[in-house]
A protein has these predicted regions:
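A detector for small-residue-rich transmembrane helices and their helix-helix packing motifs
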Residues: 1-220
Length: 220
């Protein structure tokens, strides 16, 4: 109950997303109307609202569970620290930025489709990392805790390296778009905090640059 009071928007997003996704699994018409479709957005239909609604539907239950669990664990803490309206703007901008990144990358593939709230979650992660770069975090796949900025560096580098490989069904470019959107918006909300944590921010940007350089110039 205390978490609900402290982070009402996080609960609302999680519940709404779960509800819409589950309903869409039973009704493909709803699923098809909400997902991001390049042709529907850039074609004659001009359905730009799909750039936001795609965050309400997911590929399967595992996809939904992972995104909503991640959002819940971060959101109930972070929303309380920055206020619900800022949290909402970070999340929404992240979804939009992720969709925009996907459209840019796949603009010549009209049949490309994407779903999921990963970009919004990435935006929240990016914003939290800018605000609290030294926060100690323990990941399930790593046996020891690491500072948030280190995890941010690894996440950005990984996403940049795999963004154009096409080896999986993960929208890495959407994750990057969301994360950078979250970092930028929270820096605009709290410029003094961002300035104080400039070294961590520069490190994450440098990690992205290194990932791009490796991808661009690695021996074939």
């Amino acid at each position: 109950m205390n978490a609900l009071i402290l982070a009402p928007l996080t609960f609302t997003i999680v519940i709404a997303t779960c509800a819409v996704t589950i309903v869409s699994f039973k009704n493909f018409g709803i699923y098809n109307r909400l997902l991001l479709n390049i042709d529907a957005v850039l074609g004659r239909r001009g359905q730009w609202w799909r750039m936001l609604t795609c965050g309400l539907v997911h590929a399967d239950y595992m996809h939904l569970a992972f995104n909503m669990f991640s959002l819940f664990m971060i959101g109930i803490w972070f929303e309380h620290n920055i206020a619900s309206w800022r949290f909402g703007m970070v999340y929404a901008l992240g979804v939009l930025a992720g969709s925009f990144a996907s459209i840019i990358v796949h603009r010549n593939a009209p049949s490309y489709m994407a779903v999921g709230a990963s970009a919004g979650v990435s935006a929240v992660v990016g914003a939290a990392t800018v605000m609290f770069p030294d926060l100690s975090i323990r990941l399930l796949i790593v046996p020891f805790p690491m500072p948030a900025w280190v995890i941010g560096c690894l996440y950005i580098m990984y996403s940049v390296v795999f963004a154009s490989r096409g080896m999986d069904n993960v929208g890495h470019e959407a994750h990057l778009g969301g994360m950078f959107a979250g970092m930028t918006l929270i820096a605009a909300f709290y410029p003094e905090v961002a300035l104080g944590n400039a070294l961590a921010i520069v490190a994450m940007l440098a990690a992205g640059a290194l990932g791009y350089a490796w991808r661009r110039f690695r021996p074939m």
